[in-house]
Regions:
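ABC ATPase NBD Q-loop/coupling interface
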Residues: 1-18, 123, 127
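Conserved "ABC signature" C-loop
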Residues: 30-82, 178
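Conserved catalytic loops of ABC-family nucleotide-binding domains
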Residues: 131-140, 148
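ABC-fold ATPase nucleotide-binding domain signature/coupling loops
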Residues: 62-95, 104-106, 189-191
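Helix N-cap at the start of a conserved alpha-helix in ABC-type nucleotide-binding domains
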Residues: 119-121
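C-terminal portion of ABC ATPase nucleotide-binding domains
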Residues: 71, 127, 144, 149-191
Length: 191
């Protein structure tokens, strides 16, 4: 039985809170709260305004922020504040991405982070992905293979096991591989 290492240290030797602090995660089913936008980004009542704005800008939400009369103090939803704003699923996903960036952990895990975005917003995230994650180690989880093309390494899972690993072009050359099979199954809907 193997073990997972971080900086050559078995992860079971880490303090749990310390270990969890090195990860920022954007799940496809996340929760925003009926508090201010800045508090949602920071996941805390106290937050750094400049950092929250910077993270919202990187996540593609800055234009909407500028249209909000109360800025970062604008309540998300109207549950606790009649002047709160309703946001779309895509906008909520951008706020969730900003939250992960705000945490500024060395590892960022993105589980279908563009699922609720329209195609243009999704393209913006892909085209700026390296700028968004910067020097962090990013794990990008997606069933949509076209969204994995920009990844440095792609791991293909089948039955809970890694069955292929490599870059898009190389994986596509293996006409008997699972990646090729999945890619062509999805591509048939685009032609």
């Amino acid at each position: 039985m193997g073990c997972s290492l971080n900086d050559n240290v078995d992860i079971r030797k880490y303090d749990y809170k310390e270990y969890m602090s090195i990860f920022s995660v954007v799940f496809q089913d996340f929760k925003l709260f009926s508090f201010g936008l800045g508090q949602n980004v920071a996941a805390s009542f106290d937050y750094n305004e400049e950092l929250a704005k910077k993270c919202l800008e990187k996540a593609g939400f800055y234009g909407r922020l500028q249209s909000m009369k109360k800025g970062l103090e604008t309540s998300i939803y109207k549950d606790l504040d009649e002047e709160g704003v309703e946001i779309s699923g895509g906008e909520a996903q951008k706020i969730a991405l900003a939250r992960a960036l705000y945490k500024n952990a060395p590892f960022i895990i993105l589980d279908e982070p563009t699922a609720a975005l329209d195609p243009i917003a999704e393209y913006e995230v892909y085209s700026r992905f390296n700028e968004i994650v910067q020097d962090k180690t990013a794990i990008y989880i997606s069933h949509r293979l076209s969204s994995c093309r920009f990844c440095d390494v792609i791991a293909v899972f089948d039955g809970g096991q890694i069955v292929q690993r490599g870059v898009h072009d190389r994986l596509l050359q293996d006409t008997h591989g699972k990646y090729y099979e999945l890619w062509n199954a999805q591509a048939q809907y685009y032609t």
